[in-house]
From Swiss-Prot:
Keyword tags: Amino-acid biosynthesis, Aromatic amino acid biosynthesis, Cytoplasm, Transferase
InterPro entries for the chain: Enolpyruvate_Tfrase_dom, Enolpyruvate_Tfrase_sf, EPSP_synthase, EPSP_synthase_CS, RNA3'P_cycl/enolpyr_Trfase_a/b
Protein name, per record: 3-phosphoshikimate 1-carboxyvinyltransferase
PROSITE patterns per record: EPSP_SYNTHASE_1, EPSP_SYNTHASE_2
Record: residues binding 3-phosphoshikimate: K28, S29, R33, S174, Q176, D326, K353
Compartments, record wording: Cytoplasm
Biological role stated in the UniProt entry: Catalyzes the transfer of the enolpyruvyl moiety of phosphoenolpyruvate (PEP) to the 5-hydroxyl of shikimate-3-phosphate (S3P) to produce enolpyruvyl shikimate-3-phosphate and inorganic phosphate.
EC number: 2.5.1.19
Gene Ontology terms: biological process: amino acid biosynthetic process; aromatic amino acid family biosynthetic process; chorismate biosynthetic process
Length: 443
């Protein structure tokens, strides 16, 4: 499995003002989907700006193992020659997704609609994460699961020879569940419908339409959506421009807000409203984040200018969670530097990420002198405008914990140590050198 090497510790010290103009890596969600839909399409898909982190590269390897031709033609530039819907071949070896839950779960959906069997595996972290809520709807569509106690990796998924279209209500707001069902539904005759009570990120729906699928999205209730896909289309290769990842941009954004004197511009950041809950919350806290050059290239994007700001505590409503589920860790850092109490409500989903991120976030803050409490599934941070620091943060093989802790150390009174930064490579390989280039002191 990945990351068998020794831990790579690092210490973040008080930073000089962060200044400059940078582009963070391409969006991870879009990168995974571009590779998978490219593999399911007929003809050539051209991808520019692909995130070349370990998670996405594992998805590229998996698509090649399933029969697609996947090639890198330049930095962030890739070509995929697809096999068409239902055209996957059985791989010769297990598909190893390393640390990537997204790549693994979306690929399960694609395989579930194909008449082949494939074994899915990953690193120790991914093996510990639950898969049952992805597998439940896929089994209803005709796929069969064996091994892995039926819920965890490694497991073997045998795709349905005649996938069954269905109407499925997602048990939680999860783009991964929704996407897996839609990808399996590509091979089913008739209509496959997914109903979600709370809208989750809609990258799969947008990209399916771009590749030629017949897909319709309608409102459902107060905050939900009903997505209907007509199966057995012929998807056609497309040109995909991958915008900068807002989840990666979150780290330099928060760093710039908390380091006095900072003035930082991030270019081409995706501003899809189902991904920008963090930006909304930070602005409510008093953050100076200005958009310019707003445009659309399949996904909305803009340049963001971020200046150091005095932040105040706020309450983050639970319905915002789907639009910022990966950003609560670094939001908690911002909350620690804010004046007053920040309440982040309804964070149950953080418990089933790369680690139990709810407990890990609280631990990260506590060991650095921040007053924090967990009440049920709510995280409550009592900000005092400063963070003492001085602690060592256990990352639990989680890239976002590592980056959040390093951001905290940029502005804490004393340095913050991180026990292992190796897993940052899964999503943001150049994070450390990029931050150093902006003025961060990581040693």
């Amino acid at each position: 499995m990945s990351h068998a090497s020794r831990p790579t510790p690092l210490e973040a010290r008080g930073s000089t003002p962060l200044t400059g103009r940078v582009r963070v890596p391409g969006d991870k969600s879009i990168s995974h989907r571009a590779l998978i839909l490219g593999a399911l399409a007929v003809g050539e898909t051209k991808i520019t700006g692909l995130l070349e982190g370990e998670d996405v590269l594992n998805t590229a390897k998996a698509m090649a193992a399933l029969g697609a031709k996947v090639e890198r033609v330049g930095e962030g530039a890739w070509r995929v020659h697809g096999v068409g819907v239902g055209g996957f071949r059985a791989p010769d070896a297990p598909l190893d997704f390393g640390n990537s839950g997204t790549g693994c779960r979306l690929a399960m959906g694609a395989v579930a609609g194909s008449p082949i069997a494939a074994t899915f595996d990953g690193d120790a972290s991914l093996r510990s994460r639950p898969m049952r809520r992805i597998l439940d709807p896929l089994e209803l569509m005709g796929a069969k699961v064996s091994g892995g106690d039926g819920a965890r990796l490694p497991l073997t998924l045998e795709g349905a020879r005649d996938p069954i279209p269905m109407v499925y209500r997602t048990p939680v707001a999860s783009a991964q569940i929704k996407s897996a069902v839609l990808l399996a539904g590509l091979s089913a005759p008739g209509e496959t419908t997914v109903i979600e009570a709370e809208a989750s990120r809609d990258h799969t729906e947008r990209m399916l339409a771009q590749f030629g699928a017949d897909i319709v999205t309608e409102p459902e209730g107060t905050h939900g959506r009903r997505i209907t896909l007509t199966g057995q289309p012929e998807l056609h290769g497309a040109d995909v421009v991958v915008p900068a990842d807002p989840s990666s941009a979150a780290f330099p954004i928060v760093a710039a807000l908390i380091v006095p004197g900072s003035d930082l511009t991030l270019t081409d950041v995706m501003t899809n409203p189902l991904r920008t809950g963090l930006f909304t919350t930070l602005r409510e806290m008093g953050a100076s984040i200005e958009e310019s050059d707003v445009r659309d290239a399949g996904e909305p994007m803009a340049n963001l200018r971020v200046r150091a700001s005095k932040l105040r505590g706020v309450t983050v409503p639970p319905e915002r969670a789907p639009a910022m589920i990966d950003e609560y860790l670094v939001l908690a850092v911002a909350a620690a530097f804010a004046e007053g109490t920040t309440r982040m409500l309804g964070l149950k989903e953080l418990r089933v990420k790369e680690s139990d991120r709810l407990e890990a976030t609280a631990d990260m803050l506590r060991v650095n002198g921040v007053k924090v409490e967990i009440v049920g599934d709510d995280l409550i941070v009592h900000g005092e405008g400063r963070v003492p620091g001085g602690g060592t943060v256990a990352t639990h093989m989680d890239h976002r914990i590592a980056m959040s802790a390093l951001v905290m150390g940029c502005a804490s009174d004393t340095p913050v140590k991180v026990d292992d930064t190796a897993f940052i490579a899964t999503s943001f390989p150049d994070f450390i050198p990029m931050m150093r280039g902006l003025g961060a002191d990581f040693v």
